């Protein structure tokens, strides 16, 4: 005898039945689940049906700065598009067309290399990615904009942000779109073109005192006219000072100076005599000169006057209208209009006396202050004759 106890047939049968039942049932379920999981895994491992296309093609050079960059997805939708220049600056854009198209929000810079990374998903959620790079064109002809006020300036409430371009602009909408203005407190600011080389920006009413203005000029790569591109990227910040608006009544020979809505002084003046009447309308001080020469030859009044030391002069128009000190006018101030179109205030030769009207007004004025002339026999000043767009209605300004 080997000492082992025999296993009964009944126990052996029960054991076989147990193994068969567990093994058989488990085997059947595992086969079903395994096939399902395998099918899902196989489906997930299939290549995505989504196709990403980037224009321009990879490695392209001389690419246009506007209208050339576009990312599209076929048989899927875009989930991610990243574009950046060689310095890592991102290009903002928008996915449209139900997720099938992406375009940049603005033009690209010239002579710049860009990298594009785009991802799309098909209906099963499988991703397809594509990377590309290209370089924009190097322009042969360029333009810039000279502007006023300067960065860091403090100006009066009437001062627009004015840009004068070195080339005539034939694509004004593209150029205007490249200049953005933000203010604190916020106010709607609109641009208006005077001819094809000057663009002014202003709010509907005079700036509120204390307004902070930030201008971003992103002109690099903007095609201002066929084959002529901007090359300028600048940020300009300026602040609006206190409010000062002075009203000249040519009929009464009197100027009323208002500071922050309150009258602070009334000053006797002389304006343009018959035939040389002063412009009516709202005029903005664009230049301050403690002493300057005024020669009638420069404004079409040849031989009529040549005064080498006009004191306390502030320009109101490009055509030669000033508000200035007058030491030769005698008793005209407050009594009679005797000038060749300027607004004259009593002064002394050399402008040394701080107590006279012209010195007082000069010392309390800044570029951007407003001088309004009324009751003159001349027409209203043209909006582009100086920074005098305030003489246009808001509706006309926005056209």
Give the location of each predicted region.
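Short, charged beta-turn/beta-strand-edge "cap" motif at the junction between a beta-strand
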Residues: 120-122, 219-222, 261, 291, ...
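Soluble periplasmic/extracytoplasmic beta-strand elements of cell-envelope proteins
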Residues: 53, 70-72, 82, 115, ...
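Conserved beta-strand and immediately adjacent loop positions that scaffold enzyme active sites
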Residues: 80, 117, 178, 254, ...
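Gly/Pro-biased beta-strand-loop elements
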Residues: 227-331
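Short peripheral tails and domain-boundary helices/loops at the edges of structured domains
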Residues: 148, 244-252, 391-399
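Acidic, low-complexity Ser/Thr/Gly/Pro-rich repeat segments typical of extracellular/periplasmic
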Residues: 2-242, 269
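Exported/periplasmic cell-wall-interacting domains
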Residues: 157, 296-399
